[in-house]
Amino acid sequence: MKYKVCILAAGIGSRMKPFTEHINKSLLPVNFKAVISHIIEKFDTNIEIVVAVGHLKETVIDYLDCAHKDRKFTIVEVDRFTGKGSGPGYSLMQCRDHLDLPFIFFASDTLVLEDIPPPAENWLGVSPVIETEEYCTAKI
């Protein structure tokens, strides 16, 4: 099945301050590599990756151009990445015109250690959290 990957890297990373005042949270290093690179490298080079950018967007775009020259990226500039009405849902909606295939969604501050298989069908993964006001929520 052909699919895409969508990475949201638009937010200000408020829970990671002061580290994110001058660097986008997707570029924070983990084991000497930017978080976003850990995500990108989970997928074959022929998979198109849609990246939503906002906060310090130029640094993310420049990094992707330098670190992942062999990849095809579609960059979506999110116009509202802080304040009322912003958030992952809004950023994902800004990407919708570029998500014309099944896709795997990643928040740019999420690391997954396991290999990620291509999607064979539609599914949604969620996880319970205690402090729901700090995260995106889904009512099931």
Identify the residue ranges that each predicted region occupies:
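Conserved N-terminal catalytic core of the sugar/cofactor nucleotidyltransferase
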Residues: 1-7, 15, 29, 33-102
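Short beta-strand/turn micro-motifs composed of small residues
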Residues: 9, 53, 107, 127
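Short glycine-rich anion-binding loops that position phosphate/pyrophosphate groups of nucleotides
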Residues: 11-13, 81, 109-111
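Short alpha-helical oligomerization interface
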Residues: 21-26
